[in-house]
């Protein structure tokens, strides 16, 4: 582990009494400072070019992302905490750069140069508004006046932009509009803003599902797929929508919806892994999954903070685990990586993750939830067997040391081959080893051009979803696959039956897959007509020892040795990297194992020794 990571670990390892959960405020402050210092470091200056000076240069994307002024909230917080003027200066410079380069004729902010999506004005307005609410009285008078003027213009734009209700945008936008109107009401004092936020909330409320999840991250937000799936994305829900609703409720005094929001957090907490990661492998916007959350949303700490303040079970532990995960995923340059193994893959961090998620630490610190609670396990630390979420065709399994998710979800926000379903295991996690396998988008492409990262030196990205493959056809793309799930005798069983499908929807041969997970491990039986491969990528860095001998393969990782045994020869895929594949989705690196079959069944098992 690098020196910076060791320092973070020391900050977070504050003494905790036995049988109690704690999170470290000092550790959160340290991480916030590291991220703010990195943002200051990457801020452009001295060129004399108004199109460049004040923006923040991204080492991964090699340009200045348009939403960098969202960081004003955190930079001003750090100025107040430390008294160091550099943070306030950086906030003013990035705000001014945005005004010169990222504001359209009607006062809206847009996403990036050449990416004129203006809905993100709602995030710019709420970030600026929260800054004015928390620190406006302490800002220099001329600076406050300048920021307040921009806030008014943004607010006026939003009122018109969201005048048609939910529209066709993902639900996090109308939800954040509720927050934006509450913030405007708080700052400007006009009751009309509160009324508009309340009216929008009335449209949003029906998307709170009985299962404890929030629907709406899709087009349309109220849509239901042929399978009956709702557009559910755990990342955007926990990192954007639920925090915005908590803030809306807090500002407007809507105590009546606090219990509903707590129930949503409890439902989404089912998908928090024991290491603080968020299993959004199967979500409707899983193409933006980062393991700790989602690429360009704001962070799940505020949702956990409010839930903890309301006595939510497991909230304090979740805050602690998640903060430690964020620290682990922070680079030596001080920027947040978009997943687990970017460092090991030699890929730089995109600055967007940092300037977006730094806000969530400020929200956590200002909310000041309890730093200690009784010892309360996270739901996925419990060995409960099986839990079903039919609203997006997903099954969770908790058996012995294993935690898994399987999905046949067919409702995705982004058009294109982003699928991870078709009756696939989307997460296989082990108590001692962490992530063993996970699903990632079937064919990697820039679903949102300026919001996606690619490999610096390698062309093409392998999907890491365990699957049947046959010359471009796969079970993963079969939206109509029939699935079954059962838990009995200490084992979870899951099966899928359908037609191998290409990324353009073309149909191929029939297939069947059966999975069985017990305390020992996972077994797979795959069947298809004609020649096929069953592919099972195992998370492994280039430092992890991989040995393939006939029908057996072993992966030695910290925490144990994973052994794959098949009824035929196991092969290891050659890639441009050699014997590993890397995907920007969740930042996973893997050894891609496969077995070959023809007109019959092929079997494989996975255990940890």
Give the positions of each predicted feature.
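Bacterial N-terminal signal peptides
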Residues: 8-15
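Eukaryote-skewed repeat-based solenoidal scaffolds used as protein-protein interaction platforms
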Residues: 141-221, 228-229, 234, 250, ...
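Low-complexity, Ser/Thr/Pro/Gly-enriched N-terminal "stalk/linker" regions
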Residues: 20-70, 77-103, 152
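Extended polysaccharide-engagement surfaces of secreted carbohydrate-active enzymes
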Residues: 256-259, 269-566
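Well-ordered alpha-helical scaffold segments within catalytic/enzyme domains
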Residues: 21-23, 69-85, 123-142, 176-191, ...
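Bacterial N-terminal signal peptides that target proteins for export
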Residues: 1-7
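Solvent-exposed loop and edge beta-strand segments that line ligand/cofactor-binding
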Residues: 41-69, 105-123, 159-175, 211-240, ...
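Beta-strand-rich recognition/accessory modules
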Residues: 567-609
């Amino acid at each position: 582990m690098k020196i910076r990571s060791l320092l973070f670990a020391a900050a977070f390892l504050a003494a905790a009494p036995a049988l109690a959960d704690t999170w470290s405020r000092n550790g959160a402050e340290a991480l916030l400072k590291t991220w703010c210092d990195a943002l200051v470091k990457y801020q452009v200056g001295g060129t004399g070019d108004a199109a460049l000076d004040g923006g923040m240069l991204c080492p991964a994307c090699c340009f200045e992302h348009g939403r960098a002024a969202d960081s004003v909230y955190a930079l001003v917080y750090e100025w107040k905490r430390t008294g160091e003027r550099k943070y306030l200066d950086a906030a003013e410079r990035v705000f001014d750069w945005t005004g010169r380069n990222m504001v359209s004729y009607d006062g809206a902010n847009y996403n990036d140069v050449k990416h004129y999506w203006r809905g993100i004005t709602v995030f710019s307005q709420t970030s600026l508004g929260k800054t004015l609410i928390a620190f406006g009285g302490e800002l220099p008078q001329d600076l406050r006046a300048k920021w307040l003027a921009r806030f008014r213009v943004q607010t006026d734009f939003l009122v018109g932009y969201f005048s048609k209700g939910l529209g066709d945008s993902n639900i996090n936008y109308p939800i954040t509009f509720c927050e934006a109107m509450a913030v405007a009401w708080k700052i400007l004092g006009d009751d009309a803003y509160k009324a508009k936020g309340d009216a929008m909330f009335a449209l949003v409320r029906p998307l709170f599902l009985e299962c404890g999840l929030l629907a709406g991250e899709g087009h349309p937000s109220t849509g239901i797929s042929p399978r009956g799936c709702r557009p559910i994305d755990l990342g955007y829900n926990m990192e954007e929508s639920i925090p915005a609703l908590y803030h809306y409720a807090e500002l407007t005094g809507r105590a009546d919806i606090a219990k509903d929001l707590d129930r949503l957090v409890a439902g989404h907490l089912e998908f928090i892994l024991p290491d603080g990661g968020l299993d959004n492998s199967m979500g409707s916007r899983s193409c933006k999954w980062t393991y700790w959350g989602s690429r360009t949303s704001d962070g799940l700490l505020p949702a956990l903070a409010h839930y903890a303040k309301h006595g939510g079970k497991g909230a304090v532990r979740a805050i602690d685990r998640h903060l430690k995960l964020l620290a682990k995923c922070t680079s030596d340059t001080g920027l947040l990586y978009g997943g687990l193994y970017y460092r090991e893959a030699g890929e730089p961090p995109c600055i967007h993750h940092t300037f977006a998620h730094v806000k969530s630490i400020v929200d956590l610190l200002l909310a000041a939830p309890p730093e200690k609670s009784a010892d309360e396990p996270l739901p996925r630390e419990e060995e409960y067997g099986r839990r079903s979420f039919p609203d997006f065709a997903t099954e969770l399994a908790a058996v012995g040391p294993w935690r898994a998710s399987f999905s046949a979800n067919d409702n995705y926000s982004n058009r294109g081959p982003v699928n991870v379903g078709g009756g696939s295991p989307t997460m296989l996690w082990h108590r001692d080893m962490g992530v063993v396998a996970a699903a990632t988008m079937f064919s990697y492409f820039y679903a949102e051009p300026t919001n996606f990262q690619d490999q610096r030196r390698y062309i093409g990205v392998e999907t890491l979803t365990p699957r049947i493959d046959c010359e471009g056809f796969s079970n993963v793309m079969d939206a109509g696959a029939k699935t079954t799930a059962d838990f009995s005798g200490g084992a979870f069983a899951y099966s899928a039956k359908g037609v191998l499908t290409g990324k353009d929807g073309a149909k191929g041969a029939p297939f069947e897959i059966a999975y069985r997970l017990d305390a020992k491990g996972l077994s797979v039986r795959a069947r298809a007509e004609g020649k096929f491969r069953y592919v099972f990528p195992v998370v492994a860095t280039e430092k992890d020892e991989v040995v393939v001998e006939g029908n057996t393969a072993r992966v030695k990782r910290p925490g144990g040795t994973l052994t794959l045994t098949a009824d035929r020869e196991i092969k290891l895929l050659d890639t441009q990297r050699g014997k590993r594949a890397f995907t920007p989705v969740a930042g996973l690196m893997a050894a891609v194992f496969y077995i070959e079959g023809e007109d019959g069944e092929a079997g494989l098992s996975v255990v940890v020794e």
